[in-house]
Every structure is written in C-alpha cells, then in structure tokens.
C-alpha cells in the first residue's frame, strides 16, 4: 500500500542552520529575505516537523525560524496524505511536534483520530475565524486557488469552459490532466462531494475519466507538461504556473484560467499547520506556528511563492487576481477529515491512476 512504500523512501533530516554555535552566522538566499540579521545562539528548544509542504517552498521559512530563534529544527518531508497516514500509525509514539499540510483534509483526518493538540488563542487570533478550525486544532497560513492551467498554443480563454463540470464535454476528450493522488486535489474533491453530494461528484469524476483524462502525480508536473505542450490543460493550484512563468518566461507556454467565480473549480484551499497532542515541545511548536503568520513570512509566501497571505494586514502580491472565487468561509473544512478517506477511495475507484 501507499504508506508502506512511503516508509521505505522518506528520511528524517536534521536541518542545522547555524543554531547553537558560539559564533552567530547569517542566512543567505531566500531565507535571508525573511530574516536578514545574524543568527541567534541555541536556545535549548527543539521542534520536529512533518512537512507536506514542498521542501523548496517552505525550507527557507524553516531556516529563518531556526536562525532567528535559535531553535533546533528537524524535518521529515513527504506528501501530506502519506504523512497523515504515518502519524496515525505512529500515534502517541511519533517524534513529530508539528504537522504542516498542503491542505486541511489530512489535518482533519488526524483530528478525527484525536491526535491533534490545542493551539493557543494568541496564534489563532492572527487569522480570520474562517481560516482556523472551530476546535482550535489547526490554523491556515496561506491560500491557493484552484485553476485550470492551459497551453496557450492550443487554447485561448474564450475557448475554455465556464465550469469544471464542462470538462466532460467530448470536445475536451484526452486533453485534461488530473493530479489524482495529490493532497490538494483530494481535498478539493472532498469539498466537491460535500457541496454536490457523492453521486454527482462521483459521476463527474467517472465522466471525466471516460473522457480520457490523463493522470499526473502532482500539480507541478501538470504545469510543466502544459507549458511544453505535452498536455492541453489540467486542474492545479494557481501558484505553480506563476513560479514556472517567472523561472522560464521565454519558453513556458501556459497560463492559468479561472472558472466562474462561484464554480467549485475556483475553490480557495488553504495550507494548514497544527501541533500533535503528544508533543513534548509545546512551546517551540507554538513559536513555529506563530512565526508562520508573521508579516515577513507572510510576505515571503505571497512575493516568492505566489500564495495568498492569510494573516491580517499583509497585502497579496499584485500579480495575483482578486479572490472572487468560492470563498473558504462558505466551506466547512472541519468536515474534510471525515470525508478524506472516502474521497480517496472514490478517486482510486475511478481508474484515473491508471491513465
């Protein structure tokens, strides 16, 4: 099964960021954009993070946190889904203090297993009420909008559909890519089920698979494939294409397209952070969660990774479109944990993973 495969491949990496030494050091690269000062000496604290966020996106933030606070940081990288399954298997014996998820579903799954601790009100109050769980067990720290990325040589905006439901039309046969095992896609599909019912959601997925949809393992692989013309379009998070355009402006031939404002295909999905109930490093865990919502880190997320900031007072990158999509406040993300496993089962049963 997927968990067994994961356990043989993921490694626990200790990130030594100049903490605890007698001579303070400074950061370079993207981490220096968050904290440009000298690193603190070791403070005696440590925190172990299981991160479903991609290493190249979140690692500069963790480096800056370790540098600024002097906290010893250890990280285990993996997919949000697999890490959530691993945490459930480890239970109270886990080394993890903090779990960073690409989306709320895996966090909701852990909440349903009573594995999450209570986050302090001083951290929860840094975001709007709809951006943390009602029970106070997770907090959002950035937002990603679901979009359709498309190859500009093959399509123009006026030829694209108004709704994600229209992708089952025969004129899009063999042209749509889906990241079926990706955590944010599974979360999105869980909301789809919640909004429209299991029968309608399952029928849509089966219809799009019957329309010869193609499977890719993640958002980035779809964006790259669309940019080189390997696939015509695909369902992804918005920020991957911004990053690809910034890195390869002359060769990448893909743009984002938003469905109608209230379409389920334009859902805003948030990244979520939580701490484990079994954590013995509660103070360091709270420090990290609060750090994710500081202005420099939130600015980094929107300026460098093109995500939507969630902390009050931080202005989104001017390149990002206004958030007129299906708003997160209209979706009860606390329900995602309960539907997470069922949504994954429906995705697997659809046959998309064999495409």
Model-derived segments and their meaning:
Residues 15-18:
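C-terminal motif of bacterial Sec signal peptides marking the signal peptidase cleavage site
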Residues 110-118, 129-136, 244-260:
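Ligand-binding "clamshell"
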Residues 172-180, 291-315:
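Periplasmic-binding protein-like
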């Amino acid at each position: 099964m997927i968990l067994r495969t994961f356990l043989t491949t993921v490694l626990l990496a200790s990130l030594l960021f100049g903490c605890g030494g007698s001579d303070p050091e400074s950061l370079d690269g993207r981490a220096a954009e968050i904290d440009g000062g000298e690193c603190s000496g070791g403070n005696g604290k440590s925190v172990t993070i299981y991160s479903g966020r991609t290493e190249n996106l979140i690692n500069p933030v963790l480096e800056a946190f370790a540098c600024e606070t002097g906290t010893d940081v250890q990280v285990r990288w993996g997919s949000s889904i697999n890490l959530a399954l691993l945490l459930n298997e480890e239970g109270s014996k886990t080394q993890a203090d903090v779990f960073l998820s690409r989306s709320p579903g895996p966090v909701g799954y852990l909440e349903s297993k009573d594995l999450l601790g209570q986050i302090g009100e001083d951290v929860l109050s840094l975001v709007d009420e709809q951006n943390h769980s009602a029970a106070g067990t997770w907090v959002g720290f950035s937002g990603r909008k679901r979009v359709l990325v498309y190859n500009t040589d093959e399509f123009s905006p006026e030829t694209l559909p108004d709704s994600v439901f229209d992708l089952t039309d025969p004129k899009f046969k063999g042209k749509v890519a889906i990241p079926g095992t990706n955590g944010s896609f599974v979360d999105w599909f869980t909301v789809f089920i919640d909004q429209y019912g299991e029968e309608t959601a399952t029928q849509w997925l089966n219809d799009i698979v019957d329309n010869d949809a193609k499977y890719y393992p993640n958002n980035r692989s779809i964006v790259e494939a669309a940019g080189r013309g390997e696939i015509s379009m695909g369902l992804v998070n918005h920020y991957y294409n911004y990053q690809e355009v910034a890195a390869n402006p002359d060769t990448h031939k893909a743009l984002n397209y938003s469905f109608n404002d209230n379409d389920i295909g334009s859902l805003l999905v948030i990244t979520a952070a939580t701490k484990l109930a079994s954590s013995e490093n509660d103070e360091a865990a709270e420090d990290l969660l609060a750090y994710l919502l500081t202005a420099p880190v939130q600015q980094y997320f929107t300026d460098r990774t093109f995500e939507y900031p969630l902390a009050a007072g931080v202005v989104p990158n001017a390149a990002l479109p206004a958030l007129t999509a299906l708003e997160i406040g209209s979706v009860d993300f606390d329900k995602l944990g309960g539907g997470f496993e069922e949504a994954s089962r429906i995705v697997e049963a659809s046959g998309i993973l064999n495409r």
